[in-house]
Amino acid sequence: MEKNLSSRDDDALHSLSAPSSSYNSIYDLLHYHERGNGLTINGKPSYSIEDAGDQITRDNVSWNGANVFGKSANLTFKFLQSARSTPDGDTGFVKFNAAQISQAKLALQSWADVANVTFTEVTGNQSANVTFGNYTRDSSGRLDYGTQAYAYLPGSGSASGTTWYNYNVDNIRSPDTMEYGRQTLTHEIGHALGLNHPGDYNAGEGNPSYSDVTYAEDTRQFSIMSYWSEKNTGGDFKGHYAAGPMLDDIAAIQRLYGANMTTRTGDSVYGFNSNTDRDFYTATSSSKALIFSAWDAGGNDTFDFSGYSNNQRINLNDGSLSDVGGLKGNVSIAEGVTIENAIGGSGNDLLIGNNADNTLRGGAGDDVLFGGSGADRLYGGSGRDTFVYTAASDSKVAAPDWLLDFQTGADKIDLSALNTGNNLHFVNQFSGSGGEIMLNWDASANTSNLYLNLDNNTSPEFLVKIVGQVSQTADFVV
């Protein structure tokens, strides 16, 4: 049975006599932070995305009550105008300023995008599910410079759903210009909706550290509810912070309220030229640090990272991590989401497709493109690019890939992963012996047709169509 590398099946990757460097780079990205399945990372058990979502919602409470899962909720929120003290006894109340109000609404929106929750603002004496307020002094009346914020899970008590922020902290006062302030808002709202920290720790209880985590993926690379740096799991955000729910948070909130299947059902673009109307999905310059997990309910969608000059690694498989814009492991795709297309920048990029019909554009630089299964349209762009194939199912005769800007003498078609027995060879016609490559040139259509017969018959299982004439001697890695 043929194996498709895009399915991340180990069996597809064995027994290569001399895999190429391009193949190895694909292998490395497809296996980038594998998780769950009994793995141990950093001396801790590794959790799958689903198991992490369960852990983050382990109290099993939402605004629908205890042990109610996947049920939508229409919630209210309110910016408090006064309060004698917080439920913890902190005093010195300050109402939210304009920047806090604006950023809190964006944070609420980011949760509503991924789950079946709606938020309606109320004022005056009306009660609300989620409330916002600042404090400046601790319960002893001293100015508080030691805390950041805290919140309470859903419930029927007076404290339930309240969120509180230390106004003495710069990023709390200015979440519009300081990323950690925005992340704090999203984090505390997560608590107010029913999400826990991934582990049993709190900032006010002792001196917790990453060594106290329950599972390895308890970092900000996977959850905005975590306290711990993404560097613990191999990521590097270079001092930047996420603004919206991350990969495991999406699984967690959807466990409680269900998935929002009305979000971005059209053709959405993430990154440069974004039409998402979400700041954390949008880049307008190369200085913008993108940190996000994509949730998208439909359409023909694109990751556009064309404005970066860094070497990038872009993986369109759901649940995967990508290195974008000079950061590491900073972009992910939520489980069940299909992003069809990717655009690289001017660096030497690696682009990996999924099982959909992908369009991959490498842009400038020496890029490596792997479409996986599906009828893909591949553009290397300028530079010396490599198009990698690992199985006959990567480009079927009935639905072939197209290489649309192949530069003979510069670009390469890498078939080394198919040459497991060192028996691939070019022929003028198929003999039925297997391991045969046939390259036909259609001058009238300006198209080269690359056929492979890997079985012991005379019918090809594999076809790639290439615009332009390809050289048998110069353009292949076998």
Curated annotation (Swiss-Prot):
Species of provenance: Dickeya chrysanthemi
Residues noted as binding Ca(2+) 1 in the record, renumbered to the chain: 264, 266, 296, 298, 301
EC top class named in words: hydrolase
Taxonomic classification: Bacteria, Pseudomonadati, Pseudomonadota, Gammaproteobacteria, Enterobacterales
A biological-process GO annotation: extracellular matrix organization
Binding locations of Zn(2+): 187, 191, 227
Positions bound to Ca(2+) 3: 345, 347, 349, 362, 364, 367
Catalytically driven reaction(s): Preferential cleavage of bonds with hydrophobic residues in P1'
Binding-site residues, Ca(2+) 5: 363, 365, 367, 380, 385
Family: Belongs to the peptidase M10B family.
UniProt protein name: Serralysin C
Binding-site positions, Ca(2+) 7: 381, 383, 385, 411
GO molecular function, one term: zinc ion binding
Keyword Hydrolase: yes
Residues in Hemolysin-type calcium-binding repeats: 343-360, 361-378
Gene: prtC
Note: Could be the homolog of prtA from strain B374.
Binding residues annotated for Ca(2+) 6, in chain numbering: 372, 374, 376, 394, 401
